Amino acid sequence: MHQQVKNSNYVNFQHHLNGLEIQREKLMKKKIYLIFLIILCCLCITGCEKSQDKNSIVMEDINAFRNYFENGYVFYDEINRKATINFDSKKILREYNKNFTWRKKKGLEKNCINGINQDALLVPLWNFLYDLDIKDGHLGIRTFERNWKLSKQESVYSSEYFFEKKNGNYYLLESPQKNLIGKKYTGNISDLKKIIKNNQELYFFGPSLTDGKEYEILALERKNYKVPISLIDSAFNDKAILRLVETDDSLYIRAGSFNIIKGSDEEQLFMREINKIPALEQGKKYIVLDLRGNSGGYTYYPKELVAAIYNRRKSEKQREDLWRFLNKADMGCVELQSSIIAQRKYETNIKNHQSDEIIESSRLEAENQKNNNKRYYIGLENIAPNKLPQDTGQRIDATLVILIDYYTASNAEHCIGYLYMMNKNNIILVGQNSSGTLISGNPIQYELPNSKLIVSFASTSYKNTVLLQCIEQWKGETYGFYPDYWCTETNVSETVGFITHDKKLIEQIDF
Protein backbone atom coordinates (compact mmCIF):
# COMPACT_ATOMS: atom_id res chain seq x y z
CA MET A 1 0.00 0.00 0.00
CA HIS A 2 2.76 2.32 0.97
CA GLN A 3 4.58 1.46 -2.24
CA GLN A 4 1.48 2.25 -4.34
CA VAL A 5 1.13 5.68 -2.70
CA LYS A 6 4.79 6.31 -3.30
CA ASN A 7 4.49 5.39 -6.95
CA SER A 8 1.40 7.54 -7.31
CA ASN A 9 3.19 10.54 -5.78
CA TYR A 10 6.10 9.97 -8.11
CA VAL A 11 3.81 9.93 -11.13
CA ASN A 12 2.09 13.10 -9.96
CA PHE A 13 5.44 14.75 -9.40
CA GLN A 14 6.59 13.68 -12.84
CA HIS A 15 3.42 15.12 -14.38
CA HIS A 16 4.07 18.32 -12.49
CA LEU A 17 7.62 18.48 -13.81
CA ASN A 18 6.39 17.82 -17.33
CA GLY A 19 3.84 20.60 -16.95
CA LEU A 20 6.52 22.98 -15.78
CA GLU A 21 8.69 21.97 -18.73
CA ILE A 22 5.84 22.60 -21.15
CA GLN A 23 5.17 25.99 -19.57
CA ARG A 24 8.87 26.80 -19.76
CA GLU A 25 8.94 25.85 -23.45
CA LYS A 26 5.86 27.99 -24.14
CA LEU A 27 7.42 30.88 -22.28
CA MET A 28 10.68 30.44 -24.20
CA LYS A 29 8.78 30.40 -27.51
CA LYS A 30 7.00 33.58 -26.48
CA LYS A 31 10.32 35.18 -25.60
CA ILE A 32 11.85 34.09 -28.91
CA TYR A 33 8.80 35.36 -30.78
CA LEU A 34 8.96 38.63 -28.87
CA ILE A 35 12.68 38.99 -29.60
CA PHE A 36 11.97 38.24 -33.27
CA LEU A 37 9.29 40.93 -33.33
CA ILE A 38 11.65 43.41 -31.69
CA ILE A 39 14.40 42.62 -34.23
CA LEU A 40 11.91 42.87 -37.09
CA CYS A 41 10.67 46.22 -35.82
CA CYS A 42 14.24 47.43 -35.51
CA LEU A 43 14.95 46.34 -39.06
CA CYS A 44 11.81 48.08 -40.29
CA ILE A 45 12.70 51.23 -38.40
CA THR A 46 16.25 51.10 -39.77
CA GLY A 47 14.90 50.53 -43.28
CA CYS A 48 12.52 53.44 -42.89
CA GLU A 49 15.32 55.59 -41.54
CA LYS A 50 17.51 54.60 -44.49
CA SER A 51 14.67 55.38 -46.88
CA GLN A 52 14.10 58.67 -45.12
CA ASP A 53 17.84 59.38 -45.25
CA LYS A 54 17.91 58.65 -48.99
CA ASN A 55 14.86 60.79 -49.62
CA SER A 56 16.25 63.64 -47.55
CA ILE A 57 19.53 63.51 -49.49
CA VAL A 58 17.68 63.60 -52.82
CA MET A 59 15.40 66.37 -51.55
CA GLU A 60 18.47 68.42 -50.59
CA ASP A 61 19.62 68.28 -54.23
CA ILE A 62 16.13 69.13 -55.51
CA ASN A 63 15.95 72.18 -53.24
CA ALA A 64 19.47 73.24 -54.27
CA PHE A 65 18.42 73.00 -57.93
CA ARG A 66 15.40 75.18 -57.21
CA ASN A 67 17.55 77.74 -55.37
CA TYR A 68 20.02 77.98 -58.27
CA PHE A 69 17.18 78.21 -60.81
CA GLU A 70 15.33 80.98 -58.97
CA ASN A 71 18.40 83.02 -58.02
CA GLY A 72 20.85 82.25 -60.83
CA TYR A 73 18.78 82.18 -64.03
CA VAL A 74 18.30 85.47 -65.85
CA PHE A 75 14.98 84.46 -67.46
CA TYR A 76 13.32 83.14 -64.27
CA ASP A 77 11.11 86.20 -63.70
CA GLU A 78 10.21 86.44 -67.37
CA ILE A 79 9.05 82.81 -67.43
CA ASN A 80 7.15 83.27 -64.17
CA ARG A 81 5.26 86.25 -65.61
CA LYS A 82 4.01 84.19 -68.54
CA ALA A 83 2.80 81.27 -66.43
CA THR A 84 3.28 80.62 -62.73
CA ILE A 85 6.16 78.20 -62.24
CA ASN A 86 4.91 75.21 -60.27
CA PHE A 87 8.01 73.64 -58.75
CA ASP A 88 6.65 70.51 -57.05
CA SER A 89 9.56 69.08 -55.04
CA LYS A 90 7.57 66.06 -53.83
CA LYS A 91 6.53 65.18 -57.38
CA ILE A 92 10.16 65.33 -58.55
CA LEU A 93 11.14 63.09 -55.61
CA ARG A 94 8.42 60.57 -56.52
CA GLU A 95 9.61 60.54 -60.14
CA TYR A 96 13.18 60.04 -58.96
CA ASN A 97 12.24 57.03 -56.78
CA LYS A 98 10.22 55.56 -59.65
CA ASN A 99 13.16 56.00 -62.04
CA PHE A 100 15.59 54.62 -59.46
CA THR A 101 13.50 51.46 -58.93
CA TRP A 102 13.15 50.91 -62.67
CA ARG A 103 16.88 51.38 -63.28
CA LYS A 104 17.71 49.01 -60.42
CA LYS A 105 15.50 46.29 -61.93
CA LYS A 106 17.19 46.79 -65.30
CA GLY A 107 20.65 46.68 -63.77
CA LEU A 108 21.34 50.30 -64.68
CA GLU A 109 22.83 51.34 -61.36
CA LYS A 110 25.99 53.07 -62.56
CA ASN A 111 26.57 56.79 -62.02
CA CYS A 112 25.55 56.53 -58.36
CA ILE A 113 27.05 59.22 -56.14
CA ASN A 114 26.30 59.25 -52.40
CA GLY A 115 23.53 56.74 -53.04
CA ILE A 116 21.86 58.94 -55.69
CA ASN A 117 21.59 57.72 -59.26
CA GLN A 118 22.51 60.70 -61.45
CA ASP A 119 20.44 59.57 -64.42
CA ALA A 120 17.37 58.88 -62.28
CA LEU A 121 17.49 62.45 -60.90
CA LEU A 122 18.45 64.11 -64.17
CA VAL A 123 15.25 63.01 -65.93
CA PRO A 124 12.64 64.71 -63.66
CA LEU A 125 14.73 67.89 -63.36
CA TRP A 126 15.16 68.01 -67.14
CA ASN A 127 11.43 67.37 -67.64
CA PHE A 128 10.60 70.27 -65.30
CA LEU A 129 12.69 72.70 -67.37
CA TYR A 130 11.52 71.25 -70.68
CA ASP A 131 7.85 71.72 -69.74
CA LEU A 132 8.55 75.45 -69.29
CA ASP A 133 9.21 75.61 -73.06
CA ILE A 134 12.42 77.67 -72.88
CA LYS A 135 14.49 78.25 -76.02
CA ASP A 136 17.93 78.83 -74.56
CA GLY A 137 20.98 77.05 -75.92
CA HIS A 138 22.99 77.62 -72.74
CA LEU A 139 20.46 75.87 -70.49
CA GLY A 140 21.35 72.29 -69.64
CA ILE A 141 22.04 69.53 -67.11
CA ARG A 142 25.12 67.33 -67.17
CA THR A 143 26.09 63.99 -65.64
CA PHE A 144 29.54 62.44 -65.80
CA GLU A 145 28.62 60.77 -69.09
CA ARG A 146 26.13 63.02 -70.87
CA ASN A 147 25.18 66.64 -71.37
CA TRP A 148 21.48 67.30 -71.90
CA LYS A 149 20.59 70.54 -73.66
CA LEU A 150 17.07 71.88 -73.25
CA SER A 151 16.70 73.38 -76.72
CA LYS A 152 16.54 71.28 -79.85
CA GLN A 153 18.62 72.85 -82.59
CA GLU A 154 17.03 73.54 -85.95
CA SER A 155 19.01 71.53 -88.49
CA VAL A 156 18.78 71.88 -92.25
CA TYR A 157 18.30 68.69 -94.23
CA SER A 158 19.52 68.20 -97.79
CA SER A 159 17.97 66.47 -100.78
CA GLU A 160 18.81 65.62 -104.38
CA TYR A 161 16.31 68.14 -105.73
CA PHE A 162 18.01 71.24 -107.19
CA PHE A 163 16.31 74.32 -108.61
CA GLU A 164 17.36 77.23 -110.80
CA LYS A 165 15.92 80.70 -110.38
CA LYS A 166 14.25 82.38 -113.38
CA ASN A 167 12.29 85.63 -113.25
CA GLY A 168 11.68 85.30 -109.52
CA ASN A 169 10.43 81.70 -109.75
CA TYR A 170 12.22 78.41 -109.04
CA TYR A 171 12.16 75.50 -111.50
CA LEU A 172 13.39 71.98 -110.84
CA LEU A 173 16.68 71.45 -112.71
CA GLU A 174 18.02 68.19 -111.24
CA SER A 175 16.04 65.38 -109.67
CA PRO A 176 16.16 61.58 -109.21
CA GLN A 177 12.65 61.64 -110.73
CA LYS A 178 13.27 62.81 -114.29
CA ASN A 179 9.56 63.32 -114.99
CA LEU A 180 9.48 66.18 -112.44
CA ILE A 181 12.28 68.24 -114.06
CA GLY A 182 11.09 71.64 -115.24
CA LYS A 183 8.21 71.89 -112.80
CA LYS A 184 7.72 75.12 -110.83
CA TYR A 185 8.26 75.10 -107.07
CA THR A 186 5.14 76.14 -105.11
CA GLY A 187 6.20 75.37 -101.56
CA ASN A 188 7.71 77.49 -98.79
CA ILE A 189 10.53 79.61 -100.27
CA SER A 190 12.47 79.41 -96.99
CA ASP A 191 12.95 75.67 -97.66
CA LEU A 192 15.08 76.45 -100.72
CA LYS A 193 18.73 77.02 -99.84
CA LYS A 194 21.31 78.62 -102.16
CA ILE A 195 24.21 76.32 -103.00
CA ILE A 196 27.15 76.19 -105.40
CA LYS A 197 26.94 73.10 -107.62
CA ASN A 198 28.89 72.49 -110.80
CA ASN A 199 30.24 76.04 -110.57
CA GLN A 200 26.82 77.69 -110.66
CA GLU A 201 24.31 79.06 -108.15
CA LEU A 202 21.43 76.66 -107.59
CA TYR A 203 18.92 76.06 -104.80
CA PHE A 204 18.36 72.73 -103.08
CA PHE A 205 15.23 71.64 -101.26
CA GLY A 206 16.37 71.76 -97.62
CA PRO A 207 13.72 72.00 -94.89
CA SER A 208 14.73 73.09 -91.39
CA LEU A 209 13.69 70.55 -88.74
CA THR A 210 14.25 69.75 -85.07
CA ASP A 211 13.31 66.06 -85.25
CA GLY A 212 14.88 63.50 -87.53
CA LYS A 213 12.97 62.65 -90.70
CA GLU A 214 13.72 60.53 -93.75
CA TYR A 215 11.05 62.07 -95.98
CA GLU A 216 9.43 65.48 -96.48
CA ILE A 217 6.76 66.93 -98.75
CA LEU A 218 7.98 68.79 -101.85
CA ALA A 219 5.36 71.01 -103.54
CA LEU A 220 5.56 71.30 -107.34
CA GLU A 221 2.83 72.87 -109.46
CA ARG A 222 0.65 72.75 -106.31
CA LYS A 223 1.01 68.97 -106.07
CA ASN A 224 2.74 67.26 -103.15
CA TYR A 225 5.52 64.72 -103.60
CA LYS A 226 7.10 62.70 -100.80
CA VAL A 227 10.87 62.92 -101.28
CA PRO A 228 13.83 61.53 -99.29
CA ILE A 229 15.93 63.95 -97.22
CA SER A 230 19.04 63.55 -95.05
CA LEU A 231 20.74 65.54 -92.31
CA ILE A 232 23.78 67.48 -93.50
CA ASP A 233 26.79 66.01 -91.74
CA SER A 234 29.23 68.55 -90.33
CA ALA A 235 32.33 66.40 -90.09
CA PHE A 236 34.94 69.17 -89.80
CA ASN A 237 37.25 68.36 -86.91
CA ASP A 238 40.23 70.77 -86.93
CA LYS A 239 40.99 71.56 -83.26
CA ALA A 240 43.60 74.26 -83.97
CA ILE A 241 43.27 77.24 -81.60
CA LEU A 242 44.54 79.62 -84.30
CA ARG A 243 46.22 78.74 -87.59
CA LEU A 244 47.14 80.99 -90.53
CA VAL A 245 47.64 79.98 -94.17
CA GLU A 246 48.63 82.57 -96.80
CA THR A 247 48.40 82.60 -100.58
CA ASP A 248 48.95 85.46 -103.03
CA ASP A 249 45.28 86.45 -102.96
CA SER A 250 43.90 85.07 -99.69
CA LEU A 251 44.56 84.73 -95.98
CA TYR A 252 42.99 81.72 -94.26
CA ILE A 253 42.43 82.08 -90.49
CA ARG A 254 41.38 79.00 -88.58
CA ALA A 255 39.97 79.93 -85.14
CA GLY A 256 38.97 76.67 -83.48
CA SER A 257 38.08 77.93 -80.00
CA PHE A 258 37.79 81.01 -77.82
CA ASN A 259 37.72 78.93 -74.65
CA ILE A 260 41.28 79.86 -73.76
CA ILE A 261 42.61 80.15 -70.22
CA LYS A 262 44.59 83.27 -69.33
CA GLY A 263 48.32 82.61 -69.08
CA SER A 264 48.09 79.25 -70.86
CA ASP A 265 50.20 78.05 -73.79
CA GLU A 266 47.06 78.32 -75.94
CA GLU A 267 46.75 82.01 -75.09
CA GLN A 268 50.37 82.65 -75.99
CA LEU A 269 49.87 80.88 -79.33
CA PHE A 270 46.65 82.80 -80.02
CA MET A 271 48.16 86.21 -79.29
CA ARG A 272 51.35 85.41 -81.20
CA GLU A 273 49.40 84.41 -84.32
CA ILE A 274 46.94 87.33 -84.35
CA ASN A 275 49.89 89.73 -84.18
CA LYS A 276 50.86 88.42 -87.63
CA ILE A 277 47.46 89.09 -89.23
CA PRO A 278 47.77 92.83 -90.10
CA ALA A 279 50.94 92.26 -92.12
CA LEU A 280 49.75 89.04 -93.78
CA GLU A 281 46.42 90.47 -94.96
CA GLN A 282 48.00 93.38 -96.84
CA GLY A 283 46.98 93.28 -100.52
CA LYS A 284 44.74 90.26 -100.08
CA LYS A 285 41.44 90.01 -101.94
CA TYR A 286 39.87 87.58 -99.48
CA ILE A 287 40.13 86.71 -95.81
CA VAL A 288 38.63 83.29 -95.06
CA LEU A 289 37.76 83.05 -91.35
CA ASP A 290 36.98 79.46 -90.40
CA LEU A 291 34.76 79.31 -87.29
CA ARG A 292 33.42 75.80 -87.88
CA GLY A 293 33.35 73.77 -84.69
CA ASN A 294 34.12 76.84 -82.54
CA SER A 295 31.75 76.51 -79.58
CA GLY A 296 32.70 79.90 -78.13
CA GLY A 297 34.44 80.82 -74.90
CA TYR A 298 35.61 84.14 -73.50
CA THR A 299 34.54 87.44 -75.13
CA TYR A 300 38.10 88.80 -74.95
CA TYR A 301 39.41 86.60 -77.77
CA PRO A 302 36.87 87.29 -80.56
CA LYS A 303 37.27 91.02 -79.87
CA GLU A 304 41.05 90.73 -80.11
CA LEU A 305 40.68 88.76 -83.35
CA VAL A 306 38.42 91.44 -84.85
CA ALA A 307 40.89 94.13 -83.76
CA ALA A 308 43.69 92.23 -85.50
CA ILE A 309 41.74 91.73 -88.74
CA TYR A 310 40.92 95.45 -88.86
CA ASN A 311 44.43 96.44 -87.71
CA ARG A 312 43.22 98.31 -84.62
CA ARG A 313 45.91 97.14 -82.23
CA LYS A 314 48.66 99.61 -83.15
CA SER A 315 48.21 101.49 -79.88
CA GLU A 316 46.38 100.89 -76.62
CA LYS A 317 44.08 103.84 -77.32
CA GLN A 318 43.15 102.50 -80.76
CA ARG A 319 42.44 99.11 -79.26
CA GLU A 320 40.34 100.58 -76.43
CA ASP A 321 38.35 102.70 -78.90
CA LEU A 322 37.51 99.59 -80.92
CA TRP A 323 36.51 97.64 -77.82
CA ARG A 324 34.28 100.53 -76.79
CA PHE A 325 32.60 100.38 -80.19
CA LEU A 326 32.21 96.59 -80.15
CA ASN A 327 30.60 96.82 -76.72
CA LYS A 328 27.65 98.45 -78.46
CA ALA A 329 26.79 94.93 -79.59
CA ASP A 330 25.62 94.31 -76.03
CA MET A 331 23.40 97.38 -75.83
CA GLY A 332 20.07 96.14 -74.58
CA CYS A 333 21.52 93.24 -72.58
CA VAL A 334 20.29 92.57 -69.04
CA GLU A 335 22.41 90.96 -66.34
CA LEU A 336 21.12 89.23 -63.21
CA GLN A 337 22.96 89.85 -59.93
CA SER A 338 22.65 87.71 -56.79
CA SER A 339 24.79 86.35 -53.98
CA ILE A 340 24.75 82.87 -55.55
CA ILE A 341 26.02 84.21 -58.89
CA ALA A 342 28.73 86.36 -57.27
CA GLN A 343 30.08 83.45 -55.21
CA ARG A 344 30.09 81.05 -58.14
CA LYS A 345 31.86 83.56 -60.41
CA TYR A 346 34.56 83.99 -57.78
CA GLU A 347 35.06 80.20 -57.51
CA THR A 348 35.13 79.84 -61.31
CA ASN A 349 37.75 82.57 -61.72
CA ILE A 350 40.01 80.77 -59.25
CA LYS A 351 39.46 77.44 -61.01
CA ASN A 352 40.25 78.95 -64.43
CA HIS A 353 43.41 80.66 -63.18
CA GLN A 354 42.24 84.15 -64.07
CA SER A 355 44.48 87.12 -63.30
CA ASP A 356 44.94 88.25 -59.69
CA GLU A 357 43.08 91.44 -60.53
CA ILE A 358 40.00 89.58 -61.83
CA ILE A 359 40.02 87.13 -58.91
CA GLU A 360 40.29 89.91 -56.32
CA SER A 361 37.51 91.90 -57.99
CA SER A 362 35.20 88.88 -57.99
CA ARG A 363 36.12 88.07 -54.37
CA LEU A 364 35.12 91.57 -53.27
CA GLU A 365 31.88 91.30 -55.23
CA ALA A 366 31.09 87.95 -53.58
CA GLU A 367 31.87 89.42 -50.16
CA ASN A 368 29.61 92.43 -50.78
CA GLN A 369 26.78 90.19 -51.96
CA LYS A 370 27.24 87.60 -49.22
CA ASN A 371 24.50 88.84 -46.90
CA ASN A 372 22.33 90.25 -49.66
CA ASN A 373 19.54 87.83 -50.50
CA LYS A 374 17.95 90.15 -53.05
CA ARG A 375 18.10 89.58 -56.79
CA TYR A 376 18.37 92.55 -59.11
CA TYR A 377 19.08 93.35 -62.75
CA ILE A 378 21.49 95.80 -64.35
CA GLY A 379 21.42 97.19 -67.88
CA LEU A 380 17.69 97.86 -68.07
CA GLU A 381 18.29 101.43 -69.24
CA ASN A 382 20.81 100.29 -71.84
CA ILE A 383 18.41 100.32 -74.80
CA ALA A 384 19.61 98.91 -78.13
CA PRO A 385 19.54 101.15 -81.22
CA ASN A 386 17.07 100.24 -83.94
CA LYS A 387 19.79 99.72 -86.53
CA LEU A 388 23.17 98.03 -86.53
CA PRO A 389 26.02 100.42 -85.62
CA GLN A 390 28.66 100.62 -88.36
CA ASP A 391 32.33 101.34 -87.78
CA THR A 392 33.53 104.56 -89.44
CA GLY A 393 37.24 103.88 -89.09
CA GLN A 394 39.73 102.34 -91.46
CA ARG A 395 38.21 99.57 -93.60
CA ILE A 396 39.92 96.56 -95.13
CA ASP A 397 39.87 95.95 -98.87
CA ALA A 398 39.49 92.18 -98.62
CA THR A 399 36.11 90.45 -98.70
CA LEU A 400 35.52 88.44 -95.53
CA VAL A 401 34.34 84.86 -96.09
CA ILE A 402 33.21 83.25 -92.81
CA LEU A 403 32.81 79.46 -92.59
CA ILE A 404 30.22 78.25 -90.06
CA ASP A 405 28.46 75.02 -89.11
CA TYR A 406 26.08 73.59 -86.50
CA TYR A 407 28.80 73.76 -83.85
CA THR A 408 29.64 77.44 -84.31
CA ALA A 409 28.14 78.72 -81.07
CA SER A 410 27.96 81.34 -78.35
CA ASN A 411 30.92 83.77 -78.48
CA ALA A 412 31.90 82.45 -81.91
CA GLU A 413 28.49 83.73 -83.04
CA HIS A 414 29.22 86.97 -81.19
CA CYS A 415 32.39 87.21 -83.29
CA ILE A 416 30.26 87.07 -86.45
CA GLY A 417 28.11 89.88 -85.04
CA TYR A 418 31.17 92.03 -84.30
CA LEU A 419 32.36 91.62 -87.88
CA TYR A 420 28.95 92.67 -89.22
CA MET A 421 29.31 95.83 -87.11
CA MET A 422 32.68 96.55 -88.70
CA ASN A 423 31.29 96.32 -92.26
CA LYS A 424 28.03 94.48 -92.85
CA ASN A 425 28.40 94.79 -96.65
CA ASN A 426 31.74 93.00 -96.75
CA ILE A 427 30.79 89.55 -95.43
CA ILE A 428 29.81 86.25 -97.08
CA LEU A 429 28.65 83.45 -94.77
CA VAL A 430 29.32 79.90 -96.00
CA GLY A 431 28.37 76.51 -94.56
CA GLN A 432 25.43 75.39 -92.41
CA ASN A 433 23.34 77.37 -89.97
CA SER A 434 25.20 78.10 -86.73
CA SER A 435 24.16 76.72 -83.33
CA GLY A 436 21.86 79.57 -82.32
CA THR A 437 23.02 80.06 -78.74
CA LEU A 438 23.05 83.84 -78.42
CA ILE A 439 19.89 84.68 -76.49
CA SER A 440 21.77 84.25 -73.21
CA GLY A 441 25.36 84.40 -72.01
CA ASN A 442 27.72 84.07 -69.07
CA PRO A 443 26.40 80.60 -68.20
CA ILE A 444 27.29 79.60 -64.66
CA GLN A 445 27.62 75.97 -63.67
CA TYR A 446 26.35 74.79 -60.30
CA GLU A 447 27.06 71.40 -58.75
CA LEU A 448 24.24 69.78 -56.78
CA PRO A 449 25.65 68.87 -53.34
CA ASN A 450 25.01 65.11 -53.24
CA SER A 451 24.45 63.76 -56.75
CA LYS A 452 27.14 66.06 -58.22
CA LEU A 453 24.87 66.79 -61.20
CA ILE A 454 25.96 69.97 -63.01
CA VAL A 455 23.25 72.48 -63.94
CA SER A 456 23.98 75.45 -66.19
CA PHE A 457 22.03 78.71 -65.81
CA ALA A 458 22.84 81.83 -67.84
CA SER A 459 23.09 85.10 -65.92
CA THR A 460 22.94 87.50 -68.90
CA SER A 461 20.16 88.05 -71.43
CA TYR A 462 21.09 89.21 -74.95
CA LYS A 463 17.51 88.81 -76.13
CA ASN A 464 16.98 92.48 -76.96
CA THR A 465 20.51 93.42 -78.02
CA VAL A 466 21.46 95.11 -81.25
CA LEU A 467 23.05 91.93 -82.62
CA LEU A 468 19.89 89.88 -82.33
CA GLN A 469 17.56 92.62 -83.55
CA CYS A 470 19.45 94.17 -86.46
CA ILE A 471 21.32 91.45 -88.37
CA GLU A 472 19.22 89.93 -91.13
CA GLN A 473 21.21 86.68 -91.24
CA TRP A 474 20.41 85.97 -87.58
CA LYS A 475 17.25 83.84 -87.59
CA GLY A 476 16.78 83.33 -83.87
CA GLU A 477 17.74 81.07 -80.98
CA THR A 478 18.22 77.43 -82.08
CA TYR A 479 18.24 78.62 -85.74
CA GLY A 480 21.44 80.67 -85.60
CA PHE A 481 23.03 82.57 -88.47
CA TYR A 482 21.90 81.41 -91.91
CA PRO A 483 24.70 81.34 -94.51
CA ASP A 484 24.57 83.12 -97.85
CA TYR A 485 25.79 79.90 -99.47
CA TRP A 486 24.82 76.57 -97.93
CA CYS A 487 27.20 73.65 -98.02
CA THR A 488 26.88 69.92 -97.57
CA GLU A 489 29.85 68.00 -96.21
CA THR A 490 31.27 67.57 -99.73
CA ASN A 491 31.16 70.98 -101.42
CA VAL A 492 32.85 73.44 -99.02
CA SER A 493 36.00 73.55 -101.18
CA GLU A 494 33.92 74.08 -104.32
CA THR A 495 32.03 76.95 -102.68
CA VAL A 496 35.15 78.70 -101.33
CA GLY A 497 36.78 78.26 -104.74
CA PHE A 498 33.73 79.70 -106.51
CA ILE A 499 33.87 82.82 -104.30
CA THR A 500 37.64 83.40 -104.13
CA HIS A 501 38.84 81.88 -107.45
CA ASP A 502 41.93 80.94 -105.43
CA LYS A 503 43.12 77.51 -106.61
CA LYS A 504 46.24 77.64 -104.41
CA LEU A 505 44.10 78.08 -101.29
CA ILE A 506 41.91 75.11 -102.23
CA GLU A 507 45.03 73.00 -102.77
CA GLN A 508 46.51 73.93 -99.37
CA ILE A 509 43.41 73.64 -97.17
CA ASP A 510 41.50 70.42 -96.61
CA PHE A 511 38.06 71.98 -96.23
Residue positions per predicted region:
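Sec-dependent N-terminal signal peptides
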Residues: I32-L43
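Short, Lys/Arg-enriched N-terminal segments with co-localized hydrophobic residues
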Residues: H15-L27
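Short hydrophobic targeting helices and cationic amphipathic motifs
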Residues: Q3, Y10-L17
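Flexible, low-complexity junctional segments that flank or bridge functional domains
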Residues: K50-L322, T399-V401, N426, G431-N433, ...
